[in-house]
Design a protein with these regions (language model features):
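Substrate-binding pocket helix/loop in short-chain dehydrogenase/reductase
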Residues: 3-11, 115-116
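Active-site helix of classical SDR
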Residues: 22, 58, 66
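Alpha-helical segment proximal to the catalytic Tyr-Lys
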Residues: 27, 71-72, 143
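Residue(s) in the substrate-gating loop at a strand-loop-helix junction
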Residues: 42
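Short C-terminal tail/terminal secondary-structure segment
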Residues: 46-47, 123, 134-135, 146-159
């Protein structure tokens, strides 16, 4: 069950935070010759995520935000894209795996393997993979990429 407070907090952090950040940056970006906004979404926005409805809903909304901003800001020379990380190594996914394993009554290692088995490449993404893609999109090499939602997930098909 999802409380109204949980819903509002997730929307405020995940969606509104990116909107307000972008809106504050736009006046400065309009003065740049290489302006780019990279929104961070998630593959959960495209696939859905059981028991994480507020999270998945806001990540889907970020995809729409990025696409709409790309259309609106393109004439000013500002590129906008969304990155959709999959299962990213680190403390956050470790907690998700641990909590889920406890709920299901299985070991952490068994639950982690279930997550990894959902990825075609059979490995998690690391934060540097996401950072590298963001740097590419912000670089001159990414000058003609806008309005795109780019998955960095090793081909996750279900969460």
């Amino acid at each position: 069950e999802i409380s109204g407070q949980e819903w509002r907090q997730t929307v405020d952090v995940n969606l509104n935070g990116q909107f307000y950040c972008a809106s504050q940056a736009v006046p400065l970006l309009k003065q740049s010759l290489n302006a780019s906004i990279v929104c961070i979404s998630s593959v959960a926005g495209r696939l859905g995520y059981a028991y994480r409805t507020p999270y998945a809903a806001t990540k889907w909304a970020i995809i729409g935000l990025a696409k709409s901003l790309a259309i609106e800001l393109g004439p000013s020379g500002i590129r906008v894209n969304a990155l959709l990380p999959g299962i990213v190594e680190g403390p956050r996914i470790e907690k998700v795996i641990s909590d889920r394993a406890q709920t299901l009554g299985i070991t952490y290692d068994e639950m982690e393997q279930e997550y990894i088995n959902k990825v075609s490449l059979r490995r998690m993404v690391n934060a540097q993979d996401v950072a590298n893609q963001a740097l590419f999109l912000c670089s001159p090499t990414g000058m003609n990429i806008s309005g795109q939602s780019i998955s960095i997930c090793g081909n996750v098909e279900v969460l």
